[in-house]
Regions:
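A glycine/proline-hinged amphipathic helix-loop "lid/cap" segment
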Residues: 1-60, 285, 296-301
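Catalytic nucleophile-loop/oxyanion-hole region of alpha/beta-hydrolase
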Residues: 80-81, 87, 100-135, 275-278
Length: 301
C-alpha cells in the first residue's frame, strides 16, 4: 500500500477550520472565466452541469480531452450548488478537463439506492454519447466519495467499462461504523459518531449497512481502476479510508492513500477560498498529477 503523509503546521489547520466556518456566511464568487452548461436531459435524466475553467471545451471534444465526473458531498442529504460549482471549477482549472457536476437525488426523500443510481446513470450516459471510459475520471468528496466507490462496484458487477481512475476525499466506506478512528478521533473532528449514525439512517432507510455497494468496504475489490484516496489525520473516517485502501491493495489493485496531517473532515473545502491555502494548493496539485497520470488504456470491465 502506497501512503503519503502530507505535513501541515498548526497554523495550516487553524486556517482550514476558519475557512470552513466562513464559507456559508461569506461564500466565494465563481470566477468570471467559468463556463456553465446544463446538460439535462442528456445524462440519463439526471440533472447535471458542465463546469469549465478558461473555456475548456466540453461536449463534442470530451472524448478527446477527457472529462471528470464530480460527485458532491453533504451527507447524502444536502447540496450547495454554488459551492459545488466552485469545486468543479477548481478541478477543471487544475486538470484542463471539463467537469460534469452531478445533481443526484437526496435523502431522506430519496434514500438508497437513488443517489447511487443517479451517479451510475450519469456515467453511463457519457459512454452512450461516445466518451470512452478510458477518458473519464470519477471524483467525489465525503458522501460523494462514498457514491463514487459504490458506483465502481456497481459498474464492475454489470460489466460496464470502468473509468481510467477515481479520486475520493474523505469517503465513508463502512456504514456499520466499525472503524476505530470514529472513537479515537472523537472530539478532534467536525463530525462524530452521532452524525455518522444520522447520515447512514437517513441514507439507508432500512438497507443493510454491512453489504456492498452501499457500504463499499464490504464489496469485492478486484479489477477496480487506479484509486487516489485522500483523508485528514483528525477525521473520524480516517480508518474508513485506510481500511478500504488496504483492502484494494491486498486484492492487487492500484491505490494510493494521502493522509493530510492535522486535518478534519471536509478539509478539502479549503480549495474554495479565493486566497489559496497551502493545503488547498497541495491537494489540487496531487489530484491534477494523479489524473494526468491516469493510464489511457483499453476500456476495462
Amino acid at each position: 500500500l502506497n501512503v503519503t503523509h502530507i505535513p501541515a503546521t498548526p497554523d495550516d489547520s487553524a486556517a482550514v477550520m476558519a475557512e470552513m466556518r466562513t464559507l456559508q456566511s461569506s461564500p466565494p464568487v465563481l470566477p468570471v472565466d467559468a463556463d456553465r452548461t446544463p446538460v439535462l436531459p442528456h445524462t440519463g435524466g439526471v440533472p447535471g452541469e458542465w463546469v469549465t475553467a478558461s473555456r475548456h471545451a466540453a461536449g463534442p471534444t470530451a472524448a478527446e480531452t477527457g472529462v471528470t465526473i464530480y460527485v458532491h458531498g453533504g451527507g447524502f442529504e444536502y447540496t450547495n450548488p454554488h459551492l459545488e460549482r466552485i469545486m468543479a471549477y477548481r478541478l477543471s482549472q487544475m486538470t484542463g478537463r471539463p467537469v460534469l457536476a452531478v445533481g443526484y437525488r437526496l435523502a431522506p426523500a430519496h434514500p438508497y439506492p437513488a443517489a447511487l443510481d443517479d451517479v451510475v446513470a450519469a456515467y453511463r450516459s457519457l459512454l452512450d454519447q461516445g466518451v470512452p471510459a478510458s477518458r473519464i475520471v470519477l471524483a467525489g468528496e465525503s458522501a460523494g466519495a462514498t457514491l463514487v466507490l459504490s458506483a465502481l462496484l456497481v459498474l464492475r458487477q454489470a460489466g460496464v467499462p470502468l473509468p481510467a481512475a477515481a479520486v475520493v476525499v474523505s469517503p465513508q466506506t463502512d456504514l456499520t461504523l466499525s472503524s476505530p478512528s470514529i472513537d479515537a478521533n472523537d472530539g478532534q473532528d467536525v463530525v462524530n459518531r452521532a452524525v455518522l449514525d444520522h447520515v447512514r439512517t437517513q441514507y439507508l432507510a432500512g438497507a443493510r449497512p454491512d453489504q456492498a455497494p452501499q457500504s463499499p468496504l464490504h464489496g469485492e475489490f478486484h479489477g477496480l481502476p487506479p484509486l487516489l484516496l485522500m483523508v485528514g489525520s483528525k477525521e473520524v473516517l480516517l480508518d474508513d479510508a485506510r481500511r478500504f485502501a488496504g483492502a484494494v491493495s491486498a486484492a492487487g489493485g492500484s491505490v494510493h492513500l494521502d493522509i493530510y496531517e492535522g486535518m478534519p473532515h471536509a478539509f478539502h473545502a479549503a480549495v474554495l477560498s479565493t486566497t489559496p491555502l497551502p493545503v488547498a494548493t497541495t491537494l489540487l496539485r496531487r489530484v491534477s498529477e494523479w489524473i494526468s497520470q491516469a493510464p489511457v488504456a483499453q476500456d476495462r470491465t
